[in-house]
Amino acid sequence: MEDRQLTNADNENGRKCACGGAAPFFVGLVVALVFGWWAFPEMLYSQKEQPIRFSHKVHVNDAGMECKQCHSLREDGSFAGLPSTASCAECHSDVLGSDPEEARFVAEYVKSGKEVKWLVYQYQPDNVFFSHAAHSLDGCNQCHQFSERELCNLCHLDVADSDKAPTHYENKLTGYSKQTMKMWQCERCHANENHLGVTNSSNACFVCHK
């Protein structure tokens, strides 16, 4: 009887020792991961380039195009996102210049009717709805004097002067882009009581989260 009690006690102590040894390991692992994330944040992201080298500078500065000529509104107020190959073909049915990337685009996409699989920098989660119509020049310029480019650049990367699209950083865990809008960015305007008074808008969660 005593031997059995001793055996049970030994087993209990063994289990306690095993747990006691594992706890510091897991705590150390968590600390190491958090420190690594803080010290080397880029390790969380994979870097990808766009399938076609697209020059906003040529289209915006040289050709005088505006954002809305390629990024138009849907009926629900959201942007249609990226232009289709058909819309690009309105100007690029044939090669216009000497850029080899344009020649490749015409050959691989325009002639075949294939869509370019552009990497979206600010693709939002499915539970987030953002109305571009509600954030238009007509609304913001009741008080401000933004140009279209200035208004877009409040949320989007300023690429008008770039000959190449920025590198796309994709989160290895979530699949979302590093540039996906964060709530603190929205709060720059939505936490301002003066904005709410002028626009009669609401900060209720369901306005943006569906």
Swiss-Prot record:
The chain crosses the membrane at residues 20-40. It is found in: Cell inner membrane. PROSITE patterns: MULTIHEME_CYTC (PS51008). Heme 6 binds at C205, C208, H209. GO terms for cellular component: plasma membrane. GO terms for molecular function: electron transfer activity; heme binding; metal ion binding; oxidoreductase activity. This is Menaquinone reductase, multiheme cytochrome c subunit.
